[in-house]
Amino acid sequence: MKTLHKLGLLCLLALLALPLGAAEKIRVLILDGRNNHDWVRTTESTKATLEATGRFTVTVATAPAAFAKAKPAKPKPGDAVAKKAFDAAMKEWNAEDAAFTQAHAAEWEQWVPKFADHQVIVNNYNGPEWGNAMKDAFTEFVMNGGGLVNVHAANNAFTGWDNFNEMICCGWRNATFGKRIAVDDKTGKAVALVDADEKITTKGFGSGHGAKHVFTLKTRDAAHPIMQGIPAEWLHATDELYGRMRGSADHMHVLSSSYSKPEFGGTDMHEPMVWFAPFNKGRVVTTSMGHIMAADTSYDALHCVGFQTILARSTEWAATGKVTLPVPEGFPTLDKTSVIEPSKVNWKK
């Protein structure tokens, strides 16, 4: 009996020694599988960041595979023979792509992850529109209080889906979509502009970005749980800076923004970088940070400690409405970037 008593006491002490909430990790679902960016490495890095905090358990749901055969390369202008061969090759490619799509139509329509098993979705998807069952389940999840965090090119998708456009407020859209959204530097609020307000018009009025570069993020709501303890200004590692995003500012709450410098092909305006919006009972956070392409060798945008902090805290807040995660050691300053592999970031208070 004494042995059993001691064993029970040791078990109790072990439980008391666990960090608060260690047995109740937030259940995260990452959606990926289609993207013009490197969705595989984005998911790997995102998953690593979230798991390194000790606050989350992460599952990945990958969309059915796309047609894998590469498109024929375009010939140089003026080569009539090469152009004729290219046209024939494209015709063949399009036929094969259509046949593949038709053969996998049922698989695509039936792709509906079990959203109810999770508390928050991290969206790393930018591809063809989902089937109706998937769209309905996704919408119902967020409407009923599930969290949603959209990363980088995720805001490029679903131009014609009204519910998604309401969730993200603004995204990468063409010049005829909604209003051009910027940030008023004096108030820190999102504002809708007309074409006449645009300072640089040489690149048109649709969404775009200039050259990748290091740029400063400016905190616009220091009191919000996601932003508490984050410097008023800090330097983000090399990334794309989206400009001229379009949509509606009606229910958009900006958390941070960046000035888009003309010398890097920017807009000469302050652009939203992190923002949130309610969607019925759900909380939706969107960030345009986090660029990586298949040909890129640098993880700077994803491994920036500032980005990792925003990602993890946004995910926690979207899921629970609260933030317990601290600002980790090595957070960037106004003068210096900070790029650290997710497994080496120190999240301890």
Listing of model-derived features with the role each one plays in the protein:
Residues 1-6:
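Positively charged n-region of N-terminal signal peptides that target proteins for export
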Residues 8-19:
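Bacterial N-terminal signal peptides
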Residues 23-26, 41-42, 48-53, 62-86, ...:
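Extracellular ligand-binding/catalytic regions of CAZymes and related secreted enzymes
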Residues 27-31, 38-158:
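Helical hinge/lid and interdomain linker segments adjacent to catalytic or ligand-binding clefts
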Residues 33-36, 126, 152, 202-205, ...:
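Active-site rim elements
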Residues 51, 57, 105-106, 116-117, ...:
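Catalytic beta-strand/loop cores that center a nucleophilic Ser/Cys/Thr
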Residues 114, 123, 127-225:
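A glycine-rich, often tryptophan-bearing local segment used as a flexible ligand/cofactor-contacting loop or short
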Residues 147-149, 255, 285:
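Structural detector of well-ordered beta-strand residues that form the stable sheet scaffold
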